[in-house]
């Protein structure tokens, strides 16, 4: 018989930098997870994605064992990296802060494809373009 899921914890943690310190430690402690076991496994799995924020979904079972799924970095993080800026615009409709090309958008859409509910790459590109516009980025090309 399959183990019964007791809790699901969703976090966004910098790749390879999970520590027992807040906010990771308290969130995992409340769920009853072995914090050191999770941090070691997460850091090992995400070591190749250094510098990115990685969303993770942790399933905690009734016997306090756990497993987790790492997702692709958020579209906003990938867009900021592609544009070379720290953050988006506070007034995206009037104040444009950066420009991304269609090629960059396509590359981000292909990266995010497994986590998006898009039928094809073109639909995923439209989603990423919408995120870019809402951050005050101009899409060229």
Swiss-Prot record:
InterPro entries: Ribosomal_uL11 (IPR000911), Ribosomal_uL11_bac-typ (IPR006519), Ribosomal_uL11_C (IPR020783), Ribosomal_uL11_C_sf (IPR036769), Ribosomal_uL11_CS (IPR020785), Ribosomal_uL11_N (IPR020784), Ribosomal_uL11_N_sf (IPR036796). The keyword Ribosomal protein applies. Part of the ribosomal stalk of the 50S ribosomal subunit. Interacts with L10 and the large rRNA to form the base of the stalk. L10 forms an elongated spine to which L12 dimers bind in a sequential fashion forming a multimeric L10(L12)X complex. It comes from Levilactobacillus brevis (strain ATCC 367 / BCRC 12310 / CIP 105137 / JCM 1170 / LMG 11437 / NCIMB 947 / NCTC 947) (Lactobacillus brevis). Coiled coil: none annotated. Belongs to the universal ribosomal protein uL11 family. Keywords: Methylation, Ribonucleoprotein, Ribosomal protein, RNA-binding, rRNA-binding. One of its GO terms (molecular function) is structural constituent of ribosome. GO terms for biological process: translation. Forms part of the ribosomal stalk which helps the ribosome interact with GTP-bound translation factors. The gene is rplK. One or more lysine residues are methylated. This is Large ribosomal subunit protein uL11. The lineage of its organism: Bacteria, Bacillati, Bacillota, Bacilli, Lactobacillales. It holds the Pfam family Ribosomal_L11.
């Amino acid at each position: 018989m399959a183990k019964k899921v007791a809790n699901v914890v969703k976090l966004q943690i910098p790749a390879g930098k999970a520590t027992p310190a807040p906010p990771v430690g308290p969130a995992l402690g409340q769920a009853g997870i072995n914090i050191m076991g999770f941090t070691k496994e997460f850091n090992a799995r995400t070591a190749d994605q250094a510098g990115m924020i990685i969303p993770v979904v942790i399933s905690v079972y009734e016997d306090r064992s756990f497993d987790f799924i790492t997702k692709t970095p958020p579209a906003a993080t990938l867009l900021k990296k592609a544009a070379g800026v720290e953050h988006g615009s506070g007034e995206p409709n009037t104040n444009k802060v950066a420009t991304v090309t269609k090629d960059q958008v396509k590359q981000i859409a292909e990266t995010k494809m497994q986590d998006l509910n898009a039928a094809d790459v073109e639909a995923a590109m439209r989603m990423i373009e919408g995120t870019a516009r809402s951050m005050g980025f101009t899409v060229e090309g």
